[in-house]
Amino acid sequence: MASFATIAAVQPSAAVKGLGGSSLAGAKLFIKPSRQSFKTKSTRAGAVVAKYGDKSVYFDLEDLGNTTGQWDVYGSDAPSPYNPLQSKFFETFAAPFTKRGLLLKFLILGGGSLLTYVSANSTGDVLPIKRGPQEPPKLGPRGKL
């Protein structure tokens, strides 16, 4: 692997595209051309043809289901398989929570009330400075504290 000193040569031979003005001193970076030269292979240019179905049909008015996709996959006209009382319950009590704002307010009120309850029922002696000494003090070597 070539070091940076061999890549950034003093004599300009080929400029690195995109790195010309990136040096801190303001000098341009140059590299020596490689010893191997890669020859590009000539390729034939051809037209790209995208096909939908037969005979290059891209939009078929006769078959809109396959052209635009099936939009009624999840729709159903069948009656609800759930109990009517259960359906009425969820339509009545879950309807306010379908809107994002109401759901957010409910979550904020619930979280605030939970924090209030926890802070009211917690004990304040969590820190050792508030609890005070837990054991009687030990006397020193001369019988003093």
From Swiss-Prot:
UniProt keyword annotation of Cell membrane present: no
Annotated region described as Disordered, given as residue ranges: 126-145
Annotated source species: Arabidopsis thaliana
Keyword entries, A-Z: Chloroplast, Membrane, Photosynthesis, Photosystem I, Plastid, Thylakoid, Transit peptide, Transmembrane, Transmembrane helix
Cellular component GO terms, alphabetical: chloroplast; chloroplast thylakoid; chloroplast thylakoid membrane; nucleus; photosystem I reaction center; thylakoid
Membrane spanning stretches: 102-118
Entries under PANTHER family matching the protein: PHOTOSYSTEM I REACTION CENTER SUBUNIT VI-2, CHLOROPLASTIC (PTHR34787:SF1)
Gene3D superfamilies in UniProt: 1.20.5.220
GO biological process: photosynthesis
One Pfam family cited in the UniProt record for this chain: PSI_PsaH
Topology within the bilayer: Single-pass membrane protein
Entry superkingdom: Eukaryota
Keyword Transit peptide: yes
Family the UniProt entry places it in: Belongs to the psaH family.
Major site of localization recorded for this protein: plastid
Transit peptide segment: 1-50
Localization per Swiss-Prot or TrEMBL: Plastid, Chloroplast thylakoid membrane
Name of this protein: Photosystem I reaction center subunit VI-2, chloroplastic
Cleavable signal peptide: none
Function: Possible role could be the docking of the LHC I antenna complex to the core complex.
